[in-house]
Amino acid sequence: SPRVLDLCAGTGCLGLGVKRFCPDAQATCVEKSPEAFRYLEQNVRTALPGAAPAVQAVQGDLFTYWQSLPEGQLDLIVSNPPYLTAEEMQHLQPEVAQEPAMALEAGDDGLVFYRALAQHYRDALRPGGALVLEIGWQQRQTVMELLAGNGWADIECRRDYGGNDRCIIAHRPK
């Protein structure tokens, strides 16, 4: 069974989506926000009837959770971390401005979560295992460089339906 970790899981969309696509997967969804965690727990219980034993909700922090992971045990890590800069936070569209700042802001340069992911999560993956990250539309080059500088391999960017850079895929070297 593939082992999947969803970091900054929010309500669990990514982890539960992987589980729906790959029913044999064992997914762990990690979320720091107490408010979002309540929704995550509810979704784990109800979104995929019969899947709950293989989907675990954990209240935890991306910046420390890596310390509890054994080496080489995961097949896939997915994350849609906060990625807005402090400047971008001041110019949000009204519908986005209603979201909790904790779910959006990632420090002055918008990269604090990507730095932690690049530095601390590679070895939790089995050789060849993948990391899939949502990124902001101007972050492609910087995030790819962060990953490459921390020993990730086969790094590529995928675009969304609007043609914007949206997703980075990287692998632990084989």
Predicted regions and their residues:
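Conserved SAM/SAH cofactor-binding pocket of Class I
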Residues: 1-89
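Class I S-adenosylmethionine-dependent transferase superfamily signal
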Residues: 18, 96, 117-121
